[in-house]
C-alpha cells in the first residue's frame, strides 16, 4: 500500500485529554493510522478518512482545545468526522498543519484506486486463549440400609450397617458364637428395589427383638 503522507504529530486522547506524540501515516486507501515510530509496524489505531470527514479546523479556529505544553496554537488541527467523533492533532508549525489539512481533504474526496488493499493493522502478538469444555456425568449413588436393633444383653440400641453383599447380619449377643440365648437374624435385600423393602426389614428386626425380650421374660419360670 502506497503512503500518501507521513510525519510526527501530537494527538490528544479522547478520555484523559492527554497529548501523546505519534507517527501518523495517511495511506492511499483513505485511512489514517498512527504508530509508535516511523517504521509503522506497531499500530495503535486507524481512522477512516475516505468520505468520513465533515470539516477540518486549523490554528486559531480550534477554540475548544489547548495545544501541548510548549507548542503554538497555530499548529492545531481538529478533524470532525461524520460519525460524530473528533480527532485533535497538533503539528510542529502552521505550514505543516495546513499541509496535513490539504492531504486529509483530498483523501476524503478522492475515490480509492482499484485494487487498493488495507495495510496490516498491527503486528503485535496477542496471547492465545485455550478453551476447554467439561462434560457432565451423573453421579453414582450407592444405596445402603442401616438397621437399629435392641441388644438385651447390653441394654442399648446398636446400628448395624450392611456388608458388601447387601446382607445385614444382626446379632444380639457378643459372646462365643452359637452360645445359649443367641439370636441370629439374616436380612437379605431383594435385588429388585421396592418401596416396601425398608418396612419388611423393620418388621423382621422387630420380630427378632420381640423374640429376644420374650425369652428373657419367661426365663425365671423355668427355674
Swiss-Prot record:
Domain (PH) ranges: 2-109
Keywords: Cytoplasm, Developmental protein, Membrane
GO biological process assignments: regulation of cell differentiation
InterPro entries: PH-like_dom_sf, PH_domain, PLEKHB1/2
Location(s), subcellular: Membrane; Cytoplasm
A cellular component annotation (GO) from this entry: membrane
Origin superkingdom: Eukaryota
SMART domains, per the entry: PH
Pfam families: PH
Keyword Cytoplasm: yes
Annotated SUPFAM superfamilies: PH domain-like
CDD domains: PH_evt
Tissues showing expression: Highly expressed in photoreceptor cells, oligodendrocytes and throughout the myelinated parts of the central nervous system. Detected in brain, liver, kidney, spleen and trachea.
Subunit structure: Homodimer. Interacts (via PH domain) with MYO1C. Interacts (via PH domain) with MYO7A. Binds transducins.
Protein name as it appears in the record: Pleckstrin homology domain-containing family B member 1
Taxonomic source organism: Rattus norvegicus
Gene name in the database record: Plekhb1
Amino acid at each position: 500500500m502506497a503512503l500518501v503522507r507521513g510525519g510526527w504529530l501530537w494527538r490528544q486522547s479522547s478520555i484523559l485529554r492527554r497529548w501523546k506524540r505519534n507517527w501518523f501515516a495517511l495511506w492511499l486507501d483513505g485511512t489514517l493510522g498512527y504508530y509508535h515510530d516511523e517504521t509503522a509496524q506497531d499500530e495503535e489505531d486507524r481512522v477512516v478518512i475516505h468520505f468520513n470527514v465533515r470539516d477540518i479546523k486549523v490554528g486559531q479556529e480550534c477554540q475548544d482545545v489547548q495545544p501541548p505544553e510548549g507548542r503554538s496554537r497555530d499548529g492545531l488541527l481538529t478533524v470532525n468526522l461524520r460519525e460524530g467523533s473528533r480527532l485533535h492533532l497538533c503539528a510542529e508549525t502552521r505550514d505543516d498543519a495546513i499541509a496535513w489539512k490539504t492531504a486529509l481533504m483530498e483523501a476524503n474526496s478522492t475515490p480509492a484506486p482499484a485494487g487498493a488493499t488495507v495495510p496490516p493493522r498491527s503486528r503485535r502478538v496477542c496471547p492465545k486463549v485455550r478453551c476447554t469444555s467439561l462434560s457432565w456425568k451423573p453421579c453414582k449413588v450407592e444405596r445402603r440400609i442401616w438397621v437399629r436393633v435392641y441388644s438385651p444383653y447390653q441394654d442399648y440400641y446398636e446400628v448395624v450397617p450392611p456388608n458388601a453383599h447387601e446382607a445385614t447380619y444382626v446379632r444380639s449377643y457378643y459372646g462365643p458364637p452359637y452360645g445359649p440365648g443367641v439370636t441370629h437374624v439374616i436380612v437379605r435385600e431383594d435385588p429388585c428395589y421396592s418401596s416396601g423393602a425398608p418396612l419388611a426389614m423393620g418388621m423382621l428386626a422387630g420380630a427378632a427383638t420381640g423374640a429376644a425380650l420374650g425369652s428373657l421374660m419367661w426365663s425365671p419360670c423355668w427355674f
